A protein has these predicted regions:
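A short Gly-Trp-Pro
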Residues: 1-143
């Protein structure tokens, strides 16, 4: 995870959209849900949970909204020019958004603390055996 009060910056592949996380990172999870697999074309994606109010965005992302496993809306925010994925919002507790860790300028500044939707993990995908694994997104205390 990040240090308290650490500023994290990132953006899309072409640089048209930039963002800054200025607040506490709530979690850093490797998500194995089928939606993330389809959206990324990989076995999982690494997501950083932050409050929406602590994420500032420069540029206007394009969005795509679908229904998540729970039936709530899941909105993916990405660059309309290069297609770079930036963050996901939706019906999450405490106005949390999930930023794509790979879009950080320096992804090595954070580290996963869990694996979520492990029930959907692909047999060939590998995870740190010391990370806790959850069948779904765990209930987290509100910020």
């Amino acid at each position: 995870m990040s240090e308290p009060g650490m500023k994290l910056e990132g953006g899309c592949l072409c640089g048209a959209i930039r963002y800054c996380i200025n607040g506490k990172v709530r979690f850093v999870s490797q998500c194995c849900c089928r939606d993330c697999q389809r959206a990324t074309g990989t076995g999982h994606t690494t997501i950083i949970g932050v409050l929406r109010s602590e994420l500032s965005v420069r540029g206007v992302p394009v969005t795509y909204t679908s229904k998540g496993e729970s039936g709530g809306d899941v909105t993916r925010h990405f660059c309309g020019t290069c297609g770079g994925r930036l963050y996901t919002s939706g019906t999450l507790p405490g106005a949390v958004v999930m930023v794509q860790a790979g879009s950080l300028d320096d992804p090595n500044r954070i580290a996963p603390d869990s694996v979520v939707y492990y029930k959907d993990a692909l047999s060939w995908d590998r995870f740190d055996p010391q990370l806790p694994r959850f069948e779904r997104l765990p209930q987290r205390s509100p910020p």
